[in-house]
């Protein structure tokens, strides 16, 4: 078993960098590993058009570490009022690479999201025409639907219909959490792909709920039972190009997580590729990591692969108990615990 693993530099096809003072921390953590990242638009207010995307992009670029070539790939936040013209303008910008469907109320800062899928059909038609992928948070939000069933319900009620109605539209089913979602993506046409997070590969709902509630495992879509975790691992290590890396790294200040009504999100960007390496090693599939992390994503988006490389070494190190997050701190995934792989920094 090798103690070194060299990969083409990976990209993160789903990340939350937040805004303001937090960018000084989140951008550096992402840029340490990734060449590019699809940046989620659920700010307050959300990123709804090309002008707002450009302003956010400039704030991210200003926060890059010195000499970093990290490239933020911007995303529009779809609303009931997103027009075809806004889609075309965004595509023409060259820096907006996708548009995101948040069902209203599904997750953090999604209150401005889509209330009925039919309301965005005009925008989806334009996206199919110009070649802009649709990114989907795939959960229904009706109160009577159990939180553990909301992803499957979304597939049955909405996603099948969207894929059938817009056969040329690229669709990324983001942060899939169930065997149902993995099966749907496998069986769907080639224009449908999915991202999988490190935390959904490494953990299941027992980790969050057994022996006490652990708020830093709480995320949306929520961790599912271990059979779904195993199905996600099967998909990730399969070599199927429909599945690729998307951390959904989503930081919240400690006080917003460790509270009676805590926010959803796990912060993994600080050690993302190391965490994925652990998951793939569990399946004796480190040889499949480069495809999942570095090849499948750019191929799906029609972007060039990165040409530089990173190296991981088998070396134990302790994850920090907390990290700076703007004016506060964030408790990262695996805080205070031992990680088994370490990114070899440039020049080391």
UniProtKB/Swiss-Prot annotation:
It is an enzyme of class 3 (hydrolase). The active site is at residue 248. PROSITE patterns: DIHYDROOROTASE_1 (PS00482), DIHYDROOROTASE_2 (PS00483). The keyword Hydrolase applies. GO terms for cellular component: cytosol. The modification N6-carboxylysine is found at residue 100. Zn(2+) 2 binds at residues 100, 137, 175. Zn(2+) 1 binds at residues 14, 16, 100, 248. Its EC number is 3.5.2.3. It holds the Pfam family Amidohydro_1. Catalyzes the reversible cyclization of carbamoyl aspartate to dihydroorotate. Homodimer. This is Dihydroorotase.
């Amino acid at each position: 078993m090798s103690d070194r693993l060299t990969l083409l530099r990976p990209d993160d096809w789903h990340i939350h960098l937040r805004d303001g003072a937090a960018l000084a921390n989140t951008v550096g953590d992402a840029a340490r590993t990734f060449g590019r990242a699809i940046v989620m638009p659920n700010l307050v207010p959300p990123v709804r058009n090309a002008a707002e995307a450009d302003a956010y992009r400039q704030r991210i670029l200003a926060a890059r570490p010195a000499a970093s070539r990290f490239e933020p790939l911007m995303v529009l936040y779809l609303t009931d009022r997103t027009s075809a013209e806004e889609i075309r303008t965004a595509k023409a910008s060259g820096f907006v690479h996708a548009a995101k469907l948040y069902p209203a109320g599904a997750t953090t800062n999604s209150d401005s999201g889509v209330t009925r899928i039919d309301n965005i059909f005009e925008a989806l038609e334009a996206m199919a025409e110009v070649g802009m992928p649709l990114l989907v948070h795939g959960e229904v939000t009706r109160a009577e639907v159990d939180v553990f069933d909301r992803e499957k319900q979304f597939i049955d009620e909405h996603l099948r219909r969207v894929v059938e109605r817009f056969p040329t539209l690229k669709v990324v089913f983001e942060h899939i959490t169930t065997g149902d979602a993995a099966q749907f993506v496998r069986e769907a046409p080639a224009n449908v792909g999915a991202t999988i997070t490190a935390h959904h590969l490494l953990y299941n709902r027992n980790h969050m709920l057994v022996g006490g509630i652990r708020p830093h495992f709480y995320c949306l879509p929520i961790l599912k039972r271990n059979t779904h975790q195993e199905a996600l691992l099967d998909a990730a290590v399969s070599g199927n190009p429909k599945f690729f890396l998307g951390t959904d790294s989503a930081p919240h200040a400690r006080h917003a997580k460790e509270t009676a009504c805590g926010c959803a999100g796990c912060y993994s960007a600080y050690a993302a590729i190391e965490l994925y390496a652990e998951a793939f090693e569990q399946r004796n599939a480190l040889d499949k990591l480069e495809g999942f992390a570095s090849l499948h994503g750019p191929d799906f988006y029609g972007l060039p692969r990165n040409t530089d490389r990173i190296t991981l070494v088998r070396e134990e190190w302790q994850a920090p108990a907390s990290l700076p997050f703007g004016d506060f701190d964030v408790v990262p995934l695996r805080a205070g615990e031992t990680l088994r792989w370490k990114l070899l920094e440039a020049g080391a």
